[in-house]
């Protein structure tokens, strides 16, 4: 029988929560396969069927999620996210295509600077998303990181993981900005995540000066694990290895915001990709449970 969304984890008291959930059902920044606007609804609905435990049987009931509902108008995303950040919780955003990260990362930058922190982006994706224009727009999902840099993020505090699909303008930009760390999927599939974690830990572990925004595009996973996405790229990342990488980030780094983007239920097969996103969230909740004790 269908239960309430997120079962026992949901609370109507935002002060009681340790996690705030925001849906952004927007996909007008998408260049090809659409449908990501349906992901927040689909993932919430699937959560009704998922007991509050990790894959290892660890209870998640120490977490309380406050659902801030959806904001679907692009022009209203900034104001809505400003409201949420004032509560000083962990923030989980369900997109939407990757263009939704442009306004949320802008607000996060302003938030971090008010706290005298240096804002950091860890970008897990098949694509660098560092085009200046794409399809005639500066607000395409292919332009997310370029807009972040324009808004004030330092290039040496952006790390890209899982990349394997480049536009020519992105290759040119990155060749001129070697301080921006890029880890291709081919490197990871050969060498694993060890050196990436070492680099990130050296820069940000135990740091009181940084605050991290983790942006997870589901197309970082190989399409065999995540077929329901608008711009699938072959030769991607293994879902277990990527999950373990994300878990290590949450265990060791000061992550304040995570978005999960580019899940497209209409392009999916038996909700495989939506389930992957949801199960990833639950594994992260297992780590947040320990931090919330």
Where are these regions (language model features)?
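Conserved alpha-helical scaffold segments that buttress catalytic/binding sites
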Residues: 2-293
């Amino acid at each position: 029988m269908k239960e309430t969304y997120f079962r026992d984890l949901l609370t109507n008291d935002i002060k009681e929560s340790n996690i705030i959930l925001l849906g952004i059902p927007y996909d007008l920044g998408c260049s090809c396969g659409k449908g990501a606007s349906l992901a927040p609804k689909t993932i919430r609905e699937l959560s009704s069927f998922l007991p509050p435990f990790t894959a290892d049987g660890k209870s998640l009931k120490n977490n309380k999620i406050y659902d801030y509902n959806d904001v679907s108008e692009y022009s209203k995303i900034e104001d809505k996210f400003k409201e949420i950040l004032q509560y000083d919780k962990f923030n989980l955003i369900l997109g939407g295509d990757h263009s939704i990260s442009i306004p949320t990362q802008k607000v996060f930058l302003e938030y971090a600077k008010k706290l005298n922190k240096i804002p950091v982006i860890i970008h897990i994706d098949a694509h660098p998303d560092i085009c200046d224009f794409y399809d005639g727009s500066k607000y395409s999902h292919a332009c997310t990181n370029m807009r972040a840099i324009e808004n004030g993020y330092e290039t040496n505090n952006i790390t890209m993981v899982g990349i394997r699909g480049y536009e020519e303008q992105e290759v040119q930009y990155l060749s001129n900005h070697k301080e921006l760390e890029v880890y291709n999927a081919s490197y990871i599939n050969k060498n694993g995540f060890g050196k990436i974690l070492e680099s990130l830990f050296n820069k940000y572990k135990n740091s009181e000066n940084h605050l991290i925004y983790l942006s997870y595009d589901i197309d970082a996973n190989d399409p065999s694990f995540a077929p329901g996405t608008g711009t699938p790229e072959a030769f991607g990342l293994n879902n277990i290895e990527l999950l373990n990488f994300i878990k290590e980030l949450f265990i060791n780094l000061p992550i304040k915001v995570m978005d999960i983007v580019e899940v497209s239920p209409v392009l999916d097969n038996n909700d495989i990709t939506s389930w992957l996103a949801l199960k990833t969230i639950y594994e992260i909740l297992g780590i947040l449970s320990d931090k919330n004790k």
